[in-house]
């Protein structure tokens, strides 16, 4: 019975996301309705904005950790065509920007000798720190535990390791290419 409930809830969440993610919801007052509906499903703070054609989902949700959630703090901005797999849980802090076409994955398949349907699935929680910016077309791979506060992930980067606070990374695989200047008091 619990599995049926989880299945129906996931199906409803995906269906609602498809509907509110269309261009129709890009006009006011429907844009406000999009954000209100998403707040019903996900913990989202004030200033939460999301573009069209997004997808927040939990593949293998029947086997995924029950406590895995997707949470958004204050002033999180998510552009169009973003896919966030929150099977392992994703926590997004204040003032984070996620640019268009970003893919965030929090699960992986452990390749075995038998049929694919029998392979194990591993989940990894992810935290995106305050004031981080994920550039367009970036991919965050499973196993990355944290994108640090004030970190910047460059466009088209493939992140396979933790990004430290204030670090600027880019490339495939992503590596440090710079450091954000220290925050000044009052900024």
Task: Please give the residue ranges for each predicted region.
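Terminal amphipathic alpha-helical/low-complexity segments used for targeting or macromolecular assembly
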Residues: 1-47, 95, 108-110, 131, ...
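Left-handed beta-helix
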Residues: 51-52, 57-58, 68, 73-74, ...
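Short linear capping/connector segments at secondary-structure termini
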Residues: 59, 114-117
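Metal-dependent phosphoesterase signature
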Residues: 62
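Conserved SAM-binding loop
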Residues: 82, 111-113
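Conserved catalytic-core motifs of eukaryotic protein kinase domains, centered on the activation segment
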Residues: 115-116, 144, 180
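A short acidic, glycine-rich active-site loop
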Residues: 116-126
């Amino acid at each position: 019975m619990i599995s049926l409930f989880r299945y129906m809830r996931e199906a409803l969440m995906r269906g609602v996301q498809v509907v509110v993610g269309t261009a129709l919801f890009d006009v006011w007052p429907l844009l406000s309705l999009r954000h209100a509906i998403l707040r019903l499903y996900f913990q989202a703070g004030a200033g939460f904005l999301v573009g069209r054609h997004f997808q927040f989902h939990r593949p293998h949700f029947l086997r995924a950790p029950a406590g895995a959630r997707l949470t958004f703090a204050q002033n999180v901005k998510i552009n169009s065509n973003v896919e966030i797999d929150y099977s392992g849980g994703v926590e997004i802090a204040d003032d984070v920007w996620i640019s268009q076409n970003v893919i965030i994955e929090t699960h992986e398949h452990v390749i075995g000798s038998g049929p694919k349907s029998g392979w194990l699935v591993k989940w990894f929680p992810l935290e995106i720190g305050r004031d981080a910016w994920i550039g367009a077309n970036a991919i965050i791979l499973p196993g990355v535990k944290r994108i640090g506060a004030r970190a910047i992930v460059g466009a088209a980067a493939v992140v396979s390791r933790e990004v430290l606070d204030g670090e600027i990374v880019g490339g495939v695989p992503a590596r440090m290419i710079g450091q954000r200047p220290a925050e000044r008091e009052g900024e």
